[in-house]
Amino acid sequence: MTYTRVLLKLSGEALMGSQGYGIDPAIVQSIASDVAKVVANGTQLAIVVGGGNIFRGLKGSAAGMERATADYVGMLATVMNAITLQDGLERAGVPTRVQTAIAMQEVAEPYIRRKAIRHLEKNRVVVFGAGCGNPFFTTDTTAALRAAEINADVVFKATKVDGVYDKDPAKHADAVKHPQLSYQDVLSGELGVMDSTAIALCKDNNIPIVVFNLFEPGNIGRAVAGEPIGSRIGDPA
């Protein structure tokens, strides 16, 4: 199965590579190169990006900040990442628009659902920044929400591991990978894939989720083509 319209969720941490903080230009270039190939083949692609490479609301809250304030700072971090991705994509020849859930008209369009869909129909990539504009919601939940709004076929969660495991493979050599999971498997377990709100949104709207390794060149294209990479969450295909 080839997907026509895709919502790609990128964590902020993915953009920092091995640096430990900030944005690694080589990672942005690699992502842009993979995205350019799938868009050239006619796939409509929207991106939701996190901000954890710059600031994480939960960590700010744990350090004493008011949770809502910390989340707003995190939203602004996602906008920095979104603009950086736009630059990388356009340098790779991919027309790209940034839409933010918090208005900042000097650097981005406001989020307008119908306009986002129109951009996709014109083969432009749309990068959604500032989360969903409200505190207490993760960017994973934003990805599920935007996927439902734009009628995406699938949510791709591109991470540093090649799928969903029963425990952290970085810490446990005997970790077992799950190639297929139901929404309920994830909601009932403690697999740490996405928060329960994001999974429930995808379940309610019957949007499958594919979790795969972002750092394997060509994986975005393989996922778009429906190749069996990573882990798939959803009802049986």
From Swiss-Prot:
One biological process term in Gene Ontology: 'de novo' CTP biosynthetic process
InterPro entries in UniProt: AceGlu_kinase-like_sf (IPR036393), Asp/Glu/Uridylate_kinase (IPR001048), Uridylate_kinase (IPR011817), Uridylate_kinase_bac (IPR015963)
Species this chain originates from: Synechococcus sp. (strain CC9605)
Record-stated family: Belongs to the UMP kinase family.
Protein's name according to its UniProt entry: Uridylate kinase
Leading EC class: transferase
UniProt keywords, alphabetically: Allosteric enzyme, ATP-binding, Cytoplasm, Kinase, Nucleotide-binding, Pyrimidine biosynthesis, Transferase
Disulfide bonds: none
Catalytic reactions on record: UMP + ATP = UDP + ADP
A GO term from the CC aspect: cytoplasm
Xref: SUPFAM superfamilies: Carbamate kinase-like (SSF53633)
Pathway(s) per entry: Pyrimidine metabolism; CTP biosynthesis via de novo pathway; UDP from UMP (UMPK route): step 1/1
